[in-house]
């Protein structure tokens, strides 16, 4: 591990989009241009178990990951989209979904009957609501489904020795060949604009991953008000996880069968984040991600996302040996049956396989 010291006077990420005052306390995230993120710099940050933002990643891509590209190349493919508020789903084509990006005029909230014959979906068949195409492709390996995108993504990621499937410092790349390896991605996360106001379920509800992750935004339409599009992230420190769980159990009694974070049932809107701060002094890294920006999320960091515009993102999981948030911890994983969960814990650099039975204790 590098002994490189992090300069406390470094420029932090200028998080607030124009016209969006945010009065809640938040941690500031370190940022680096893609060209300046070296392995020693990354290791110095990663040893602290804190998230990191990288700028200018889009310059490394050769393919334009935009709605037009996906309409042209995959528009006739069938896909399942999910409504962010209700979790209901429907089958449409990829083209139906992406043609709505940036078209806000006819959109209506879920539950609205709409004045238009198409139900508020602009002729797409989507109907009212905020729709997302997540974990795409859902079952097929990304490399097999989209070989050209896989190659483009692999050559564009920052710190490839850690992030790529075949990265020499990625423990997941050393998984035994004679076993079924976990699907660590890449996966795409495409969602329409949502809101972080009272009652919103966001775009991705609060959850925690057992693997490290890199999430890159490749495209954002302008927001409904015409401002540059972005997505708002809340990332919570590992050491605040127990307070976060206590708050969720107190605030949402009797809705969790298992761990309240891993259940992925709650989005902490502005009012809930305010209450969390006032009661427990827990704040998040509040980060506004824009096109070309990549966020590194350490394993064990609870996080949630709300798209403030229509956004396209691609993410991949990886494993390192220095996960401060997981060492010495029991990881709570919500399981409803006897499931073989592959957990790549850094025990002497070897992969470990654990069988989890029943809902674990926090």
Language model region names:
Residues 6-47, 60-294, 301-340, 344-362:
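Active-site region of the double-stranded beta-helix
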Residues 54:
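Basic nucleic-acid-binding interfaces
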